[in-house]
């Protein structure tokens, strides 16, 4: 699902207003009502669509209404409902599954489903950019009051959130048929997949097999439009549940062009690379900040030109949002004249010397929810789609 510029601007406007008013319950609820009247739907970083609404727009039960008035230990006090995500089956009168999102009086975000409350994040802004889980580890149970103090529980949930914050989000599934071939307007032949060969890369400490085009495939020729981009599906590693699918793009640039998104779900993504001429230089993602993605519908993929400086680091010039979708960083490849062999953020794609004047990027974008539910976790395999604009 693609958003128009006006729709995206309206979503960003309401999300910014909700974030700024999250500390004032009455003002926050008023903004939620305005967003509900405008039919605002925001997408979480896990690709769940959150319909912004209050409890007047859903089928609420008695326990939920009690939570909104009284709260629950250790988050006692009035709560505000700001959204819901639902699963519908056919033309049924009620949703098959309904998860309600609540904001406590002290700013924490909680999820409610079938009488069980789950801790999700310590702030409203953090909620949109953190992996989501519904399990016994973050469930708030009725016997809590007899076990620990309020401060002990807050500390316990903060540690849980810190762990979830650094949990990479993998979009898994099978690529839809319309993305299973190279687009006809691209600069690579439609039978290009026959020329693919797998390479090994290290992704979050796990050896995965990725595929990349051969040098013969990428070699520009007179009858190819080297200024275009390629939409291409690549069959990546198999695991016990689903297949990881990746889209590669081929672009011409004098320096380096990186298309990436956050892979640790922290407040920013940081990438630095020495501009040395020798091979073997890898990225240390602890220096120059390339991407600050706050106050978006969710964190967006950034495409930007990067130039070397006297300090042998890359600076960003004229960043722009290229997509409204977000995912894990898979990597990028620099050009020969820059001299950086690869950019590693999640997975390195540059296992061989790159072609002069080109960089290779990969990123999935659109997907269905990939979320760990408390119920039937064996059925959480979801489909994902990917398109590189």
Swiss-Prot record:
Q: Name one GO cellular component term.
A: host cell cytoplasm
Major localization listed first in the record, in broad terms: host cell
Residues making up the signal peptide according to the UniProt record: none
Localization terms from the record: Host cytoplasm; Host nucleus
Q: Which GO terms describe its biological process?
A: symbiont-mediated perturbation of host apoptosis
Keywords (A to Z) from UniProt: Host cytoplasm, Host nucleus, Host-virus interaction, Modulation of host cell apoptosis by virus
Q: How does it assemble?
A: Interacts with host MDM2; this interaction leads to the stabilization of host TP53.
Task: Say what the protein does.
Answer: Plays a role in the inhibition of host apoptosis to facilitate efficient viral replication. Promotes stabilization and inactivation of host TP53 through interaction with host MDM2.
Which family is annotated? Answer: Belongs to the beta-herpesvirinae UL38 protein family.
Q: Which protein is depicted? A: Apoptosis inhibitor U19
Record the organism.
Answer: Human herpesvirus 6A (strain Uganda-1102)
């Amino acid at each position: 699902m693609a958003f128009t510029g006006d729709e995206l601007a309206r979503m960003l406007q309401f999300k910014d207003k909700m974030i700024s008013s999250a500390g004032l319950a009455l003002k926050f609820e008023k903004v939620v009502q305005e967003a509900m009247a405008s039919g605002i739907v925001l997408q979480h970083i896990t690709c769940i669509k959150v319909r912004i609404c209050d409890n007047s727009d859903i089928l609420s039960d008695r326990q939920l209404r009690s939570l909104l008035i009284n709260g629950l230990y250790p988050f006692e006090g009035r709560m505000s409902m700001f959204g819901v995500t639902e699963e519908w089956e056919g033309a049924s009168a009620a949703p098959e599954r309904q998860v309600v999102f609540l904001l406590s009086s002290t700013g924490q975000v909680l999820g409610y489903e079938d009488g069980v409350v789950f801790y999700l994040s310590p702030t409203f802004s953090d909620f949109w950019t953190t992996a989501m889980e519904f399990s016994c580890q973050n469930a708030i149970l009725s016997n809590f009051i007899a076990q620990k103090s309020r401060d002990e529980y807050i500390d316990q949930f903060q540690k849980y959130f810190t762990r979830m914050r650094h949990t990479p989000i993998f979009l898994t599934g099978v690529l839809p048929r319309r993305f299973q071939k190279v687009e006809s307007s691209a600069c690579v032949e439609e039978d290009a997949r026959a020329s693919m060969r797998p390479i090994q890369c290290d992704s979050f400490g796990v050896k995965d097999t990725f595929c990349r085009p051969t040098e013969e495939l990428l070699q520009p020729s007179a009858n190819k439009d080297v200024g275009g981009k390629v939409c291409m599906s690549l069959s990546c590693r198999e695991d016990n549940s689903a297949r990881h699918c990746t889209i590669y793009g081929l672009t011409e640039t004098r320096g380096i062009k990186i298309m990436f998104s956050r892979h640790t779900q922290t407040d920013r993504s940081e990438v630095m690379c020495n501009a040395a001429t020798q091979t073997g230089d890898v990225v240390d993602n602890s220096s120059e900040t390339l991407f600050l993605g706050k106050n978006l519908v969710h964190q967006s993929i950034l495409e930007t030109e990067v130039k070397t400086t006297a300090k042998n680091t890359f600076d960003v010039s004229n960043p722009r949002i290229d997509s409204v979708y977000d995912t894990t960083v898979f990597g990028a490849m620099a050009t020969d004249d820059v001299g950086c062999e690869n950019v590693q953020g999640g997975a390195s794609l540059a296992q061989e010397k790159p072609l002069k004047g080109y960089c290779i990027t990969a990123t999935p974008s659109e997907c269905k929810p990939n979320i760990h539910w408390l119920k039937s976790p064996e059925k959480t395999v979801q489909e994902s789609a990917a398109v590189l604009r």
